[in-house]
């Protein structure tokens, strides 16, 4: 999709969001976990189940981190599956860096707790639970790759968009665990 966007919008900055390392995890360890449990590794079910459009049947194909631990999957295996998912994305980004003109920046929308204890005397945290602020969640990489070519950007006046009801925005933020 990134290359298609570059073709369609050659004079625009592109923001390309990879779903990994969000679930489903990809890579050999994730495949072995799926063989062992019948499900892939996933995120935190309680936050997601608050969404109005939550699809329990679809979500049941994924283990929450807690489910994976209870099924005998070690913290280290979960961390390995997570790292392999990131490695798979990095492979894809390497070719994009070469193919897309101009500077490329790699960053993340958030970090992930992988069974660590960010709060003294607290329990282990998994995923990105709502209401938790920690370095593991908030400190993300920012890596810049310069290019010999500079992308020529074209500014255009903003297009009129229909306004969104503030209550709809608030509801969506609550559904995503931000409120």
Predicted regions and their residues:
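Catalytic domains that recognize anionic headgroups
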Residues: 1-179
């Amino acid at each position: 999709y990134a290359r298609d966007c570059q073709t369609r919008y050659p004079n625009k900055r592109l923001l390309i969001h990879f779903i990994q390392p969000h679930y489903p995890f990809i890579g050999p360890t994730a495949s072995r976990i799926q063989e062992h449990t019948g499900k892939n590794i996933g995120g935190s079910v309680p936050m997601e189940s608050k969404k109005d459009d939550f699809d329990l049947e679809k979500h049941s194909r994924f283990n929450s981190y807690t489910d994976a631990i209870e099924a005998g999957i070690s913290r280290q295996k979960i961390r390995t599956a997570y790292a392999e998912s990131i490695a798979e994305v990095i492979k894809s980004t390497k070719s994009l860096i070469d193919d897309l003109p101009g500077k490329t920046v790699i960053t993340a929308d958030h970090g992930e707790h992988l069974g660590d204890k960010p709060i003294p005397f607290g329990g282990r945290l998994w995923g990105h639970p709502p209401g938790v602020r920690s370095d593991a969640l908030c400190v993300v990489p920012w890596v810049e790759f310069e290019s010999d070519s500079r992308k020529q950007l074209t500014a255009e006046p903003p297009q009129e968009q229909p306004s969104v009801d503030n209550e709809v925005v608030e509801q969506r933020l609550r559904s995503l665990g931000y409120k």
